[in-house]
Every structure is written in C-alpha cells, then in structure tokens.
Amino acid sequence: DVDKLEPSEEFMEKFAPQYKAVNDFVSEKVGTFTESIATRPAYFGPSAFIDFIHSLQLELTGADVSFAAPLSFDAKIDKGDITISDMFSLYKYENMLYTMNLTGAEIKGFLEESYAMWTNRMKSPDDHLLLLKERKKGQENYASFVNFSFNFDSAAGIIYTVDVTKPKGEKITILKMADGKPFDENKTYKVALNSYRGNGGGELLTKGAGIPQDELKSRIIHSTDKDLRYYMIQYIKEKGVLSPQPLNQWQMIPQDWTRLAAERDCKFLFGE
C-alpha cells in the first residue's frame, strides 16, 4: 500500500515549489454559486448542472441549439466560493467547442440515438426509466448504466418531449424552438457541441443523425482556440455571482409513469 510509505524528504523538498504552484492554482477562487449543482438530476430531466453548460455554449457561439452531457457520473459542486478545482468537476475533459450545421431531421436523429442509449422503453409503470444493468450476485451494492453516461446528450434551444414508452426513432417530439418559433426538420440550424461529439464520439452524429464520418469536418463552422473549461472559468469570473437554474426545455413523458420511476431509479443508482 503506497499510502503507508514514508515520502522521500529530498523529493518533497525538490518539488515543493511546483507542488505549491499547482495547489495555489487549483485553489484560486473563480466566483460564487448561490445554489449547489449536481449531475444526478441530469439523468431524469433538465438540470442546473447541464443547463449551465448549455447556456454557456449558446452564449459563446450564438448557435440555435446546444448539445451537452454529464461528463462525470456523479459530480457535485456545493454552493459558495467556486475554485479552479471545482471547474474540473464541472467539465473534466479538454474539449474544444464546435459550432456545426445540422438539419432539423439530423437534430432529431441525434437525440433519438442519445435517449435510446439512456432511457429504457417502459412497458409498465413499474419498469426502470433508465437503461440500467441489473445487479449481479455478489455486487448488490453496485449499480450502473448499460452505456456510458458521458454520451447522454440533452439539448437546449428547443422544446421537446421524450416518450419513454416508445421505441427508438419515435421517442423524441420537438415541439418548437425555445424562442417560440416553429421547428423545421428541413431547415439547417447552427448547433453548439463539444469537439469529442463533433468528431463523431459516441456515434450520435454518425449512427444517430446519419452523417457519414468523413462528412463531419465539412459541417464544422467554427472551433474555439481554447478548451471549454477555459471559457467557463472566464465566464464565471466575469459574472462573479451566479445562480444556476434548470432551463426546463424538455421532459420525459408520460409523467405519471416517469415521476415515480425516476425516484426508484435514483435510489437504485445512488442508494439514496
């Protein structure tokens, strides 16, 4: 067990300045959150955590629609002072921010693929809402998704429902744009998403939207020079104090099924 080993005094002394520099950097205050935010609610509906990312992406790009997913399975940032260290919980990967051209039909196909990996097809009110692995014998305390949660993209900029009783291809109904304008499957929209997704990660653009892998590059209108976390830090510094709230632009239906199923699945996943 490495924890029980005595550290080398010579080593600790030699690298003390670097250790202090890193520690000072990650401890630097960025701003203040008046509300705590967590990824847990993001699996069951709109959440302040993911919608903060959506809002930032839309503001930075001027896009019509934003796609984003919970990059950490179970992350939380407590209200109060926010540090650089917290920003790695909020956004753990070094992704750039892309703006891409997608048609309305491709946006729907993208979301169909995402929610098919994320949600179960409920046949009764007692079924799981989420697509979860059943617990194995001897691993009763361990629960997980069938698929990686960092591929569970939701959208902002559009108002839509997810019918969890329907099969893939029929789950998503996009009602309108968030500003009230009609949503048109034949129209081309500007979409903000991270570079992992924009390069085909998770197959949401290829398998879901139906765009060939070799066509993705030509769909990119713009890419940021720096990673998304950098822009988040600058954004929070500029605002000073933020009160992250859900945008409430989508919901899982039928709600008389999903509400109770969400409570059950939250306990199944997180034990509380």
What is the role of each PLM region?
Residues 1-272:
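Catalytic centers of hydrolytic enzymes
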